[in-house]
Amino acid sequence: MFKVVICDDERIIREGLKQIIPWGDYHFNTIYTAKDGVEALSLIQQHQPELVITDIRMPRKNGVDLLNDIALLDCNVIILSSYDDFEYMKAGIQHHVLDYLLKPVDHAQLEVILGRLVRTLLEQQSQNGRSLASCHDAFQPLLKVEYDDYYVNQIVDQIKQSYQTKVTVSDLIQHIDVSESYAMRTFKDHVGITIVDYLNRYRILQSLQLLDRHYKHYEIADKVGFSEYKMFSYHFKKYLQMSPSDYCKQAK
């Protein structure tokens, strides 16, 4: 769901953070690494990560220069520093970085920071989704936060966690102790649409948040769980009565 760029000129540090931290537990499924600020800036501009973890002292472009370059971008920054980097750290304060970590990095402390960050990111995503949903009739069934049926709530939660994958109804209900026919009937009774319909509407809703982030449309299709672009385009037109390209033109 989220992306992170890890920048440090010491390979053992950047690869250690990539391998040791259970990123998936914090909804980060794409991890990029860079050995200096120049590489990091290129990755950040190309992939627009939600989080950047960067060392301060690096060759070619140091961490403070990198912060200056990405000051206007919507990403969170964690600075890695040594005890003698205080002057560099002060320079970073003006950029409102998320946090500072001393080397060697305390992985438990980093995970605490990630936990706080992901709660904020998920809440922002939820608010953005509700705002978009309220503007389109097709997404009205997605606005309800909770249903009065345990199994329905479990399925909705599973959809929100799994929509980016090629998930099936069987996959969505495998963790609840009911038959597929019962789950499908109960879901339709409470929500008013089928499980598959809800899943596809949710995927299209999430795609709207990606359309203004410079992704190619086939990339968006893949990111929200459609196996091929033509299926994404079909469902987009089905729910919004226009193509993704027309939607982008209208939004400008």
Curated annotation (Swiss-Prot):
Domain Response regulatory, first and last residues per copy: 3-118
Keyword Lipoprotein attributed: no
Gene3D superfamilies named among the record's database cross-references: 3.40.50.2300, Homeodomain-like
Residue positions, PTM 4-aspartylphosphate: D55
Localization (cell): Cytoplasm
Entry function: Member of the two-component regulatory system HptS/HptR that regulates genes involved in hexose phosphate transport system in response to changes in extracellular phosphate sources. Activates uhpT expression to facilitate glucose-6-phosphate/G6P utilization by directly binding to its promoter. Antagonizes CcpA-dependent transcription of a subset of CcpA-regulated genes involved in antibiotic susceptibility.
Protein name, per record: Transcriptional regulatory protein HptR
Source species: Staphylococcus aureus (strain N315)
The organism's taxonomic lineage, starting at the top: Bacteria, Bacillati, Bacillota, Bacilli, Bacillales
